[in-house]
Design a protein with these regions (language model features):
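Catalytic active-site module of serine/aspartate enzymes centered on a nucleophile-bearing elbow/loop
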Residues: 256-284
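Conserved hydrolase catalytic core segment
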Residues: 130-159, 163-165
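Conserved acidic catalytic loop of the alpha/beta-hydrolase fold
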Residues: 114-130
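Conserved alpha/beta-hydrolase "acid-adjacent" motif
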Residues: 237-242
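Short beta-strand/loop motif that positions the catalytic acidic residue
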Residues: 224, 230-231
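N-terminal secretory signal peptides
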Residues: 1-3
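Conserved HGGG/HGGXW glycine-rich cap/lid loop of the alpha/beta-hydrolase fold
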Residues: 43-101
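N-terminal export signals
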Residues: 7-26
Length: 284
């Protein structure tokens, strides 16, 4: 990484730290938005909206069991409550999340693409062209997929505790291989989806030519001109090294202080930086 770029990234985090002020967080339960369904062919996506302003698509964490409930469960902060005062927040249950209400085909040959279909299809359904996006966990690879497929529609992207590939994930017993339990869960909920089909889906998604952020190459990240903000993590499924590599490679990337979740007093700093980033890049 260019020494000047490393210094700029460090300076950005330092400025955010210096200007941070305490905030009230939505760690406690909050009122949910109004839920609706978006349907396209055999796909049925449950989504909710809250607030008004420039559209902000919020992708919940939770791996393949990502649902809107993530935001009122035990996240670092409740992004819906935090941003609905300035943005039209839109979020949805992931297709075929066992605990969610979204359903659709298990597309073995195009797993990542099928999720991008849902995310962009929901924006189309709502009549939204340009939007910003913030994703937790598996939302990181989803965002890179969206940036590759529809770069002109995304004004800015925030990747919080993003998923990334590490060689240890080849070990079936590794804690970071979060997708291993999904086939049994989804086939139990939907008997028409065989466990074999579900296993083929996750193998294609996470184990076939797996590398980096799963959905794009390093060469793509090097030329991506969309503004991004990375909030790294360091747990088995969220490798710090991959998150930082994205921040170093992407020409218009910023990065938060790390660690930003511990001690808890640092979370307001991270949220303040997200607010500043979104305001800086949303269209006037």
């Amino acid at each position: 990484m260019d020494p000047k770029r490393r210094a700029l990234l460090a300076a950005g985090a330092a400025v955010a730290a210096a200007t941070a002020v305490p905030r009230v967080f939505a760690g406690q339960p909050a009122a949910r938005g109004t839920g609706k369904f978006f349907e396209k062919g055999p796909v049925r996506i449950y989504y909710e909206e809250a607030g008004s302003g420039f559209p902000l698509l919020l992708l919940p964490g939770g791996g393949l069991n990502a649902t809107i409930g993530f935001f009122t469960g035990n996240p670092p902060f409740n992004a819906i409550e935090e941003f609905k005062g300035e943005y039209r927040c839109i979020t949805a249950d992931l297709r075929n999340a066992p605990a969610g209400q979204s359903t659709g085909p298990v597309e073995v040959d195009r797993p990542w693409e099928s999720y991008a279909d849902d995310q962009l299809g929901l924006m189309d359904h709502l009549g939204i062209d340009k939007f910003m996006v913030m994703g937790f966990c598996l939302g990181g690879p989803f965002i890179w997929s969206l940036l590759k497929r529809a770069p002109n529609r995304i004004a800015g992207a925030v990747l919080a505790q993003p998923v990334g590939w590490r060689p240890e994930m080849r070990d079936p017993g590794y804690a970071g291989a979060f997708w291993k339990g999904w086939p049994a869960q989804i086939s139990a909920k939907r008997p028409e989806v065989s466990k074999q089909t579900a296993e083929q889906f996750v193998i294609k998604m996470f184990e076939t030519d797996a590398d980096f952020v799963f959905t794009v190459t390093r060469d793509f990240v090097r030329v991506c001109q969309n503004p991004i903000l990375v909030l790294p993590d360091e747990v088995p499924a969220h490798p710090y090294a991959v998150a930082m590599e994205c921040a170093m490679l992407a020409p218009r990337a910023e990065v938060s202080v790390f660690p930003w979740k511990e001690p808890k007093e640092r979370i307001p700093l991270a949220v303040r930086q997200i607010h500043s980033f979104l305001r800086a890049h949303r269209p006037v």
